[in-house]
């Protein structure tokens, strides 16, 4: 009888330890952060859904960290987050302190991986495929009228057109001044336009050309046209996943799951997803799920 009691006590103790162990596991989900912008919310949802389905690990997603890179990177270093979507030139310039143009786009990923591993014990996994950089945008009507395909084409007729941009872009050296110098642009007039009103001003005909980003929601509709940066003036911002190395060790299936994001998005696809959220009012989680299902990356 005494032996049975001891065995029962040991069994109960083992169960308590087992339950505690399970509870501990649940308290340590993979922690993902995103910047405060629409496409980052959708990317965070994609990463979350892929990881949860492919690996079974629990994910804790924190959307919209104020300050973006400047606050997420220090939090990553402290272990407060395990991974987040980041842009190549943001890492190269803002985090590592390099200058734009020091390395080619082809070399960028391997250089980032090398320096992040050395400095932070982190790495970059895959490139999603899209490039969120500055874009020069005009209306389809103006593009047809003046036969505009590139920024060099724009330079030939810029003295007949009005440019409207947000004050920050118009003032910063690598924005409008640098673009104008690179292409010899000389607009009839330049107007300050609030960042949220640029496309509306373009649509109304108040301006003919504006600055945007290559994945802006409005670009997914065919009433506007992005002019090709044929002199490669703009710095490229390709998106990838920054992840702590210890997270890859702790969660064995994580790396191969993150690799599934490689090459799945183009500028046009990302702009379309942004449009669905911003203009059609869809939830980011729904948009992410529909996209991943269409790509064959989710089963349900």
PLM region spans:
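Ligand-binding "clamshell"
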Residues: 95-106, 110-125, 206, 218-232
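Short, well-ordered beta-strand elements
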Residues: 25-39, 57-64, 159-165
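C-terminal motif of bacterial Sec signal peptides marking the signal peptidase cleavage site
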Residues: 17-21
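A conserved helix-loop-strand patch within extracytoplasmic ligand-binding domains
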Residues: 106-162, 245, 263-267
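Short, polar/charged alpha-helical segment
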Residues: 38-58, 76, 81, 177, ...
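Short helix-initiation/N-cap motifs at beta->coil->alpha
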Residues: 38, 61-74, 91, 167, ...
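Ligand-binding pocket segment of bilobal, Venus flytrap-like solute-binding proteins
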Residues: 82, 159-230
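Beta->alpha turn/N-cap motifs
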Residues: 65-68, 79-92, 108-109, 138-139, ...
């Amino acid at each position: 009888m005494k032996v049975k009691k001891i065995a029962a006590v040991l069994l109960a103790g083992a169960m308590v330890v087992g339950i505690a162990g399970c509870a501990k596991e649940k308290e340590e989900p993979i922690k993902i952060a995103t910047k405060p912008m629409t496409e980052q919310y959708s990317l965070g949802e994609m990463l979350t859904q892929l990881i949860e389905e492919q690996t079974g690990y629990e994910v804790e997603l924190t959307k919209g960290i104020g300050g973006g890179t400047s606050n997420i990177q220090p939090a990553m270093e402290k272990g407060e987050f395990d991974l987040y979507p980041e842009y190549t030139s943001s890492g190269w310039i803002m985090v590592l302190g390099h200058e734009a143009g020091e390395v080619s786009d082809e070399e960028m990923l391997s250089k980032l991986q090398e320096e992040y591993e050395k400095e932070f014990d982190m790495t970059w996994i895959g490139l999603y495929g899209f490039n969120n950089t500055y874009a020069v945008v005009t209306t389809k009507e103006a593009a047809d009228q003046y036969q505009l395909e590139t920024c060099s084409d724009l330079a030939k007729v810029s003295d007949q057109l009005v440019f409207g941009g947000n004050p920050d872009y118009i003032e910063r050296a690598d924005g409008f001044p640098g673009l104008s110098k690179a292409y010899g642009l000389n607009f009839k007039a330049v107007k300050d336009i609030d960042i949220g009103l640029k496309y509306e001003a373009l649509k109304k005909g108040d301006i003919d050309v504006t600055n945007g980003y290559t994945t802006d929601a409005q670009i997914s509709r065919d009433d506007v046209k992005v002019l090709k940066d044929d002199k490669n003036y703009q710095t490229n911002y390709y998106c990838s996943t920054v992840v702590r190395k210890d997270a890859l060790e702790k969660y064995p299936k994580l790396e191969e799951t993150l690799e599934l994001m490689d090459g799945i998005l183009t500028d046009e696809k990302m702009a379309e997803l942004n449009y669905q959220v911003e203009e059609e009012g869809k939830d980011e989680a729904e948009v992410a799920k529909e996209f991943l299902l269409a790509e064959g990356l989710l089963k349900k």
